[in-house]
Amino acid sequence: MASPARAPVLALKDVRLADGAKPLFDGVDLALEPRVRACLVGRNGAGKSTLLKILAGQGVEADSGERAVQPGAKVVYVSQEPEITGETLLDYATAGGAQDYEAQAALADFGLDPDKSAKGLSGGETRRAALARAFAEQPDVLLLDEPTNHLDIFAIQTLEDELAASKCAALIVSHDRAFLNRVTERCFWLEHRKIRRLDKGFSEFEAWAESIMAADAEEARRLDKVLERENAWLARGVQGRRARNEGRRRALLALRAEKKDRQSELRGTMTMAVESAGTSGKRVVEAKGVTKRFGERTIVENFSTRILRGDRVALVGPNGAGKTTLVKLLLGELERDAGTVQLGTNLEVSYIDQARMALSDKITVWDFLTPGGGDSIIVRGHPKHVAGYAKEFLFTDAQLRQPVTSLSGGERNRLLLARALANPTNLMVLDEPTNDLDMDTLDLLEDLLADFDGTLILVSHDRDFIDRLASSTIALDGKGGVVETPGGWTDLMDQNPDFFKASKGGTAFAPVSKAATKPAPAAPAAPKKSAKLSYKDQRRLEECEALIAKSPAIIAKLEEALADPNLYTRDPATFDKTMKALDKARADLEQAEMEWLELEEKKENLAG
């Protein structure tokens, strides 16, 4: 016998809201039962944050519809930009009604000192403080708007653990796929101003959404055919204007309005492209024995790496570990205490920075895109009107003359992308590029970077983003320890599962047990260096494996061409060229097989 349906703890019914003449919600229904953890997904500008505010009963009121909260239920909302008040973090965390001991435990879970001043916090500290306060209040419903922004990977994992342990229902807006995959069991899709519901976690969402979009596209094609037929009917003359055909004419006008609505949504699709600035040298960056300290704190010690043309290198580590510092060291923008850094030839660097430092609040969007003045921007070598280019990044004409201060976090990020992508580049550096981006823009950015034929250095906390893009990952533990492994975040953790364990006690984020009443013990000694191949050897091993796999087909094709008895007499130049290519392919295969055997033997010896 099926279990009875539970009454929702928070619900919306037939909610409608318009932004001026533009409808935002048109009959939205949403119900959240106790202890259900769900995500709210939707494209840029769909109104996800607005809907959370309506659910929270804070700041936005619907034009019509109902909001129902279970009697006695406590709803807590954490916005994208929480404001921290009070003298200390404990003052802030108890302001919502939590007891001191509850607030202290929650702050400790997120690695925060209750006595720390509430002023001058970093973005990550602000976010952790807001989350700690929310959990300390023990809500029945938790509404989270982009909760992983500015958090490092370890703080995100703590948030995942807190959600799993909590008895509250939760509705989450986030672009972080790995996070949503781990914490959600239901998806609400805000699309076409209504809500569609999937009673499965986010891991099932994208396949489900694609099937719905395919069905919608087929329905749109059917409606277009009907509209074409009805337009022809109306064009035949006055018959279409007679009273007895008024119903048919109204239906035609409704079809036209629906098509116009669909077209306006399609126009809200962002486009991106990037052009290489020409080929850089094969060696992009070579660092040897690099050491950097700030006072007594070591960022990196005796670190060496080589970044080659086409590499996609991710940098990960706790907030404050020195990832941005290492980027500046590798680019030669910061003096080293020891070691050398050599940059390759013909480098054109494009840098999108974490703190959005390139954006001045005093200028407008137009001014930022045209630093030299005028009404045109040079895009990949050709002039383009700034208004047209801005529209490709979803900026309206009205926004062009607005100050940067009026932009949301996601809009600021898009503005930086717009300017950076206008210039040809062969070395792109992105420092936390996924903050504030919606999933559609994030997908587009991933596609762009995957097709980019230059070199990429990426600082990110987004595990899924790293796994999809990175060819290698450099991890910093915050105490000078650095490890580099092929692949993304998952590969890093598979190969170095204990790397960060010894470091947490000394980094900016150090979670503490709720039961802890004494200071945390000193961190254990850093683990011994893993007995594995060096990064260079591992990279060469993989290159050899790839060459061994593809060479037989190449050799067979060349041998087939040479089997033509008339090739030499018909085209001696092609015969010679093919023969040389065959000799080279055979020699390369033999060399790769020899190196592979040597490296595999070395790997076995290291493993003991």
UniProtKB/Swiss-Prot annotation:
The gene is uup. ATP 2 binds at G317, P318, N319, G320, A321, G322, K323, T324. Its main location: cytoplasm. It comes from Caulobacter vibrioides (strain ATCC 19089 / CIP 103742 / CB 15). Residues 7-217, 285-512 form the ABC transporter domain. This is ATP-binding protein Uup. It is found in: Cytoplasm. Residues 522-608 are annotated as: C-terminal domain (CTD), binds DNA. Disulfide bonds: none annotated. Probably plays a role in ribosome assembly or function. May be involved in resolution of branched DNA intermediates that result from template switching in postreplication gaps. Binds DNA and has ATPase activity. GO terms for biological process: DNA repair. HAMAP family: Uup.
